[in-house]
């Protein structure tokens, strides 16, 4: 995941 996104 990225800084502003959940780890999906």
From Swiss-Prot:
Lineage top rank: taxon: Eukaryota
Gene Ontology cellular component list: extracellular region
Modified residues (Valine amide): 8
Annotated GO biological process: neuropeptide signaling pathway
Localization per Swiss-Prot or TrEMBL: Secreted
Main location: secreted
Classification via InterPro entries: Periviscerokinin
Keywords of the record: Amidation, Neuropeptide, Secreted
Range of residues in the leader sequence: none
Tissue expression summary: Found in the abdominal ganglia and perisympathetic organs. Sometimes detected in the subesophageal ganglion and thoracic ganglia. Not detected in the corpora cardiaca, corpora allata, hypocerebral ganglion or frontal ganglion.
Family: Belongs to the periviscerokinin family.
Function: Mediates visceral muscle contractile activity (myotropic activity).
The protein's name in its UniProt record: Periviscerokinin-2
Lineage, top ranks: Eukaryota, Metazoa, Ecdysozoa, Arthropoda, Hexapoda
């Amino acid at each position: 995941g990225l800084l502003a996104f959940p780890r999906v």
